Amino acid sequence: MIHACSVATKSSFSEFMLLKRSIELFHDVSWTISCDPYASNELSKFSNVRVLNLIESDEGCSHGTDDKEKTRRFTELAMTKFNAVEDSIDRNGYGLFFDSDIIFANPIDERVVELLNDEKIDAVLCPHMTNNLGLEAQVGHYNTGLFSLRSKSMLKTHVFLSSNPENGFYTDQQAIQFAAYEHTVLNLPINYNIGWWRFNERHTAPRLELLHIDDGKIKFGNLDAVCFHVHTLKKLDYKNYGQFLLDKILGLMDNSKNEKYYEIAKMIRGIN
């Protein structure tokens, strides 16, 4: 059983349902979700979802624009993920958080599942792996679209630093880097949380060619491509920098001869 957490609202609901369906093609999952009223009503139908009614509305929220008010509202909404993670820690020992715009293509490795349940591991984190150290000095070493926490001490530090942007931290992404300094953490390899930023430099763009189909599965080099981090169904008020990656994923799925991928591709394209 995977104990997963996320945030779901009216505008992100279709993407969350894609995340939910894609991971459940490979794992049994119990969910703890921070919701607005729309998502709460829809998700209450599922026996494996615990709903936390923490969000009034997602209107006027965005983190991809220069609008300070939209960014403030988005940050306020995003902070509720810590409530979901803490609730899961209390009930399950850990909380594995996913942004709603994550798509699973292969199961989580059994070794990672074991380590999620290992009481000696305080957190499981995903480095950005941009190979651009100057950029990561600004935005943070880790991407917080996928992380797991077991340590409530680390959670509290993460929340404190994320709640105080006047300290100079880049929301929760840089904050989790500093929170990790005093804890035992596991870094996930490059085949997890595969986002557009891993292909965004001249010297990293060739990585895209490492994505291929082998025996009906999407591979990243020699590794199974476990999950991708890319917007699919949510209407954005900024450029979708990951469109090239989404196009690549769909092309691979279309040619995979894998029924699970056909189902995921249909959901991405909005086909029932």
Where are the regions that the model predicts?
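N-terminal anchoring/stem segment of glycosyltransferases
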Residues: 1-67, 90-92, 245-272
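Short, solvent-exposed loop/turn segments at secondary-structure junctions
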Residues: 11-12, 38-40, 57-59, 102-104, ...
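Amphipathic alpha-helical segments that form well-ordered structural scaffolds
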Residues: 18, 22, 26, 84, ...
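Short, hydrophobic beta-strand segments that form beta-sheet elements in well-ordered domains
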Residues: 30-37, 123-126, 228
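Extracytoplasmic beta-rich repeat domains
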Residues: 73-74
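GT-A fold catalytic core of metal-dependent nucleotide-sugar glycosyltransferases
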Residues: 77-131
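A recurrent flexible, glycine/aromatic-enriched loop bordering the glycosyltransferase active site
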Residues: 133-146
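Catalytic core and acceptor-binding pocket of nucleotide-sugar-dependent glycosyltransferases
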Residues: 144-240
